[in-house]
Design a protein with these regions (language model features):
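Residues that mark the start of a beta-strand
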Residues: 64, 79-80, 103
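Glycine-rich Rossmann-fold phosphate-binding loop(s) that bind the pyrophosphate
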Residues: 85-87
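Generic hydrophobic/aromatic pocket-lining and core-packing "Φ" positions
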Residues: 94-95
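A Rossmann-like FAD-binding core segment of flavoenzymes
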Residues: 4-30, 35-38, 99-191, 230-237
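N-terminal Rossmann-fold NAD(P) dinucleotide-binding loop
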Residues: 90-91
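FAD-site-proximal beta/loop scaffold in flavoenzymes
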Residues: 48, 53, 58-75, 166-213, ...
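Active-site acidic short loop of glycosyltransferases
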Residues: 38-39, 78, 159, 197
Length: 237
């Protein structure tokens, strides 16, 4: 932010609610009601965690349900926790929690996991980890400082915290019909972030098929900015 201010780049605290392409420019409609006209657009809105859609989960958000083990895992040292999910994040979360929690339940709705086989084998050897397959959580109830999980098998579990790792949702709803998206809603891009709409670039977690880390997002931004600047020089001089 400081770097942008030094370069006298205007920073708007607003939200884009729609983007359209005219013959020569992009029209960016803002939530405040104003509209911006741009020669190019770099779209880097990121992705958010998919929320649990279980009866009782909404009121437990931030009060027993977390989406970040590295942020909140330490609060459950010596306590019981549940991880819901079947990908790499779920397996990694369960492995990390197994080092600090008394008991970890890893719950997956399918029989097989999508995550790394090696991590799964490590979890299977952990005495304080119970892997529950082909099972869904039907309801959650807060009871004092504990949370009751009601499983579709009829079993009930009691934990102090729940970590959800059921995937990410890219913030690309406003791009439908403007650029090509994959089946999960991520932007399909070329090497420098160029999309199917000439002059429109994607960067960071909105891009399809890439490692989702801060360092790769920063690299995406640099590549897209360079490409966008070159596009303006080539088309508007």
């Amino acid at each position: 932010t400081d770097h942008a201010k030094k370069l006298e780049i205007e920073i708007l605290e607003d939200e884009a609610k729609g983007i359209t392409k005219t013959e020569k420019y992009f029209q960016v409609e803002l939530k405040s009601g104003s509209c911006l006209e741009a020669k190019t657009v770099i779209y880097a809105a990121g992705a958010s965690h998919r929320r649990l859609m279980i009866p009782g989960s909404k009121k437990l958000e931030g009060n027993g349900i977390s989406y970040c083990v590295s942020c909140d895992g330490a609060f459950y040292q010596g306590k019981d926790a549940a991880v819901i999910g079947g990908g790499n994040t779920a397996l990694d979360d369960a492995l990390l929690l197994s080092e600090i929690c008394r008991k970890v339940f890893l719950i997956h709705r399918r029989e097989s996991f999508r995550g790394a086989y090696g991590t799964l084998k490590l979890l299977e050897k952990k005495k304080n980890v119970e892997i529950i397959r082909s099972t869904e959580v039907k309801k959650l109830e807060k009871r004092g400082r504990e949370i009751q999980l009601f499983l579709d098998s009829g079993r009930e579990l009691t934990v102090h915290g729940i970590f959800a790792a059921i995937g990410m949702q890219p913030r690309t709803e406003i791009l439908k019909g403007l650029v090509n998206l994959d089946k999960n809603g991520y932007i399909q891009t070329e090497e420098e972030g160029l999309t199917s709409a000439e002059g429109f670039y994607g960067a960071g977690d909105v891009r399809a098929g890439k490692l989702r880390q801060v360092i790769t997002a920063a690299a995406d931004g640099a590549a897209a900015a360079t490409a966008a600047a070159r596009y303006i020089l080539e088309h508007y001089q």
